[in-house]
Amino acid sequence: FFPTPDTSSISVASYGIAIRIEQIILLPAIGLNFACLSLTGQNFGAVKYDRIREGYLICLKYGLILMVCGSLFLYFGAGYFMKIFTDDISVISTGIHYLQIAALFAPILPVLNISIALMQGVKKPIYTVFISLFKEVVGAAIIIWLLCFYLNYKLQGLWVGILIVNYLSVIIFLFIVNNQMKSLGLEIFRRK
């Protein structure tokens, strides 16, 4: 848990419960990561780059569909899900706020995870280290510090910071993916 001006037991409990609920919602999309990794690895070895593109785009499509549906459950069911784990009104209220923000970035999480699987499948896993360092350390520290301490948004700054870091990570990684795939002679996001 990132140090914020609000490190009360309420915020820690809320985040602990909410992150587990978020992970449950993300579970259906996890299988697509492994599918993309397997398909990419096989087709990369067989030098069938068009099939890599096709598999990647299909996994992205279904990942987005799954997570848009999951986001709707997360956003509108946040209160119900929090009440399953606690009766404390303060914890529920804080958790609802986080889950509703998490619902805004949940649809893009499979994009990052499936893209990471794609890069691993084409034997370029080093880029996943860079994006993970940005997402979990450098970008998170800078953005969350700015929001929580400099702009004084406190706990709300942490939640919004997580949203911003996730979106930036996906945007940066999609540029990396597109660039690296072009170096292999494969244009993932080509125009028709």
Residue ranges and their predicted role:
Residues 14-78, 109-131:
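Small-residue-rich hydrophobic transmembrane alpha-helices
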Residues 29-37, 102-121, 127-139, 143, ...:
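Short runs within selected transmembrane alpha-helices of multi-pass transporters and secretion channels
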Residues 8-11, 125-126, 154-155:
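Membrane-helix interface segments
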Residues 1-18, 24, 42, 80-89, ...:
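Helix-terminus/linker motif at the lipid-water interface of multi-pass membrane proteins
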Residues 40-105, 148-192:
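Short alpha-helical transmembrane segments in multi-pass integral membrane proteins
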Residues 16, 22, 92-100, 135:
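Alpha-helical membrane-interface segments at transmembrane helix boundaries
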